[in-house]
Swiss-Prot record:
Keywords: Disulfide bond, Protease inhibitor, Serine protease inhibitor. InterPro entries: Bowman-Birk_prot_inh, Prot_inh_BBI. GO terms for cellular component: extracellular region. The record marks 20-21 as: Reactive bond for trypsin. Pfam families: Bowman-Birk_leg (PF00228). Serine protease inhibitor. Disulfide bonds join 12-31, 18-29, 38-45, 42-59. Belongs to the Bowman-Birk serine protease inhibitor family. This is Bowman-Birk type proteinase inhibitor A2. Expressed in bulb (at protein level). One of its GO terms (molecular function) is serine-type endopeptidase inhibitor activity.
Length: 69
């Protein structure tokens, strides 16, 4: 089975829950980052209520990310 190369994945500063696959490159995670716009491949983008007044979003589906170490 193949998966996307790490370099081509959306970046995520705070990866939350992840699958436990081997090798590690096969893992998919939920990104806990709150951003102005979800990445193109996100299949479940949810609006997050914040006090800033600006619309912010979080991708809540398991996706392939380039997680910050």
């Amino acid at each position: 089975q193949t998966w996307p190369p790490v370099e081509g994945r959306p970046s995520c500063k705070r990866c939350g829950a992840c699958t436990r696959m081997w090798p590690p490159e096969a893992n998919r995670c939920v990104c806990d980052d709150i951003v102005p716009q979800c990445h193109e491949g996100c299949s479940k983008c949810e609006k997050v209520d914040t006090r800033s007044g600006k619309p912010l979003y979080q991708c809540q589906s398991f996706e392939y990310y380039n997680c910050a170490a």
